[in-house]
């Protein structure tokens, strides 16, 4: 299965007692599929992977693979701070039914570019899944440079990159590396339309947890090269782009999901959305219902 279009980085629903809410998880998965998403990420940073036990990771991924049943690709977040642990987690994800591993640069340890290259080559060689590189320097403390990516794209098991940096020059440098076997995916909702109009294959999104159809519509327009229509739709979604970054991810998007009946909060050290931002969450959650309906109608008419 190819990677393109709208791919949701799923939030993990918890119940009032803080345990996994598997009923909410299954409802979220089905809502995403109904909204037209073209891929799903389980247990990434938006999914609070760092707060999950091994058993919970297994449960989420196994349930997702079973429910999705091959309708769209399932990517598992497997990146950890050490290479051996990342390889083991990637093998674990393969056994649980993931089709791809989303492998973030090792957090906190700040390897050199040579170290990053060696790390990703080892995971690609030994992990047992196709690897999507993930660069998000604001979270990890290190930046996977395009020239290093250029040295990795020839590996048959390295199939793409999720790039969270939004600078046009960074996007252009990565898009120049794309091929039939290597895709570039935006990891930033706010700049994704520009990235796709510039040649990126899609978006791994946070806000699409709450608005799968609306972000599918954005991706369709941008990937089709409909510049004016994509810009107009992007402007319509700009409040959601901005809101989902108003506090640490996934705090804001989980506030939207909670208002839609999916989940009841976060795990420490993350706290619920601050009181100052609750009115915006109320308004945007209400507006999302109409926006999703409009998106579905427009996609049917297209």
UniProtKB/Swiss-Prot annotation:
The UniProt catalytic activity note for this protein reads: L-aspartate 4-semialdehyde + pyruvate = (2S,4S)-4-hydroxy-2,3,4,5-tetrahydrodipicolinate + H2O + H(+)
Q: Which InterPro entries does the record associate with it? A: Aldolase_TIM, DapA, DapA-like, Schiff_base-form_aldolases_AS, Schiff_base-form_aldolases_CS
Record-level GO BP terms: diaminopimelate biosynthetic process; lysine biosynthetic process via diaminopimelate
Task: Tell me which UniProt keywords the record has, alphabetically.
Answer: Amino-acid biosynthesis, Cytoplasm, Diaminopimelate biosynthesis, Lyase, Lysine biosynthesis, Schiff base
Pfam families attached here?
A: DHDPS
Q: Where does pyruvate bind?
A: 46, 204
The listed locations are: Cytoplasm
Q: In which pathway does it act?
A: Amino-acid biosynthesis; L-lysine biosynthesis via DAP pathway; (S)-tetrahydrodipicolinate from L-aspartate: step 3/4
Q: Where is the active site?
A: 134, 162
| Presence of keyword Repressor | no
SMART domains per the UniProt record, alphabetical: DHDPS (SM01130)
Where is it found, in Gene Ontology cellular component terms? cytosol
Listed EC numbers = 4.3.3.7
Q: Where is this site: Part of a proton relay during catalysis?
A: 45, 108
Q: Record keywords: Nucleus included?
A: no
Q: Which GO terms describe its molecular function?
A: 4-hydroxy-tetrahydrodipicolinate synthase activity
NCBIfam families in the cross-refs: dapA
Function recorded in the entry: Catalyzes the condensation of (S)-aspartate-beta-semialdehyde [(S)-ASA] and pyruvate to 4-hydroxy-tetrahydrodipicolinate (HTPA).
- Family membership, please give it: Belongs to the DapA family.
Which HAMAP family does the record cross-reference, listed alphabetically? DapA
Spell out the subunit comment. Homotetramer; dimer of dimers.
Q: Which PANTHER family match?
A: 4-HYDROXY-2-OXOGLUTARATE ALDOLASE, MITOCHONDRIAL, DIHYDRODIPICOLINATE SYNTHASE
Descriptive protein name:
4-hydroxy-tetrahydrodipicolinate synthase
Organism field:
Xanthomonas axonopodis pv. citri (strain 306)
Organism ancestry: Bacteria, Pseudomonadati, Pseudomonadota, Gammaproteobacteria, Lysobacterales
């Amino acid at each position: 299965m190819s990677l393109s279009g709208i791919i949701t980085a799923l939030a993990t629903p918890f119940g009032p007692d803080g345990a996994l809410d598997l009923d909410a998880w299954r409802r979220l998965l089905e809502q995403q599929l109904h909204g037209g998403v073209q891929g799903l990420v389980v247990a990434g940073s938006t999914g609070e992977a760092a707060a999950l036990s091994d058993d919970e990771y297994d449960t989420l991924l196994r349930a997702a693979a079973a429910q999705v049943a091959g309708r769209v690709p399932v990517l598992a977040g497997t990146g950890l701070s050490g290479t051996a642990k990342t390889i083991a987690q990637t093998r674990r994800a393969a056994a649980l039914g993931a089709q791809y591993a989303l492998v973030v640069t090792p957090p906190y340890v700040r390897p050199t570019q040579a170290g990053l290259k060696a790390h990703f080559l080892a995971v690609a060689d030994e992990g047992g899944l196709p690897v999507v590189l993930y660069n998000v320097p604001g979270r990890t403390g290190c930046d996977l440079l395009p020239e290093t990516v250029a040295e990795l794209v020839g590996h048959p098991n390295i199939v793409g990159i999720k790039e969270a940096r939004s600078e046009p020059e960074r996007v252009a440098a990565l898009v120049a590396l794309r091929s039939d076997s290597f895709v570039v995916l935006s990891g930033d909702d706010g700049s994704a339309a520009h990235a796709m109009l510039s040649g990126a294959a899609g978006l791994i999104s946070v806000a699409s947890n709450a608005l799968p159809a609306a972000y599918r519509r954005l991706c369709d327009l941008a990937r089709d090269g409909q510049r004016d229509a994509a810009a107009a739709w992007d402007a319509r979604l700009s409040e959601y782009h901005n809101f989902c970054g108003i506090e640490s991810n996934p705090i804001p998007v989980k506030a939207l999901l909670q208002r839609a009946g999916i989940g009841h909060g976060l795990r420490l050290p993350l706290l619920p959305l601050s009181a100052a931002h609750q009115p915006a969450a109320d308004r945007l959650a209400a507006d999302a219902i109409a926006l999703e309906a409009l998106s579905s109608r427009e996609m049917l008419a297209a």
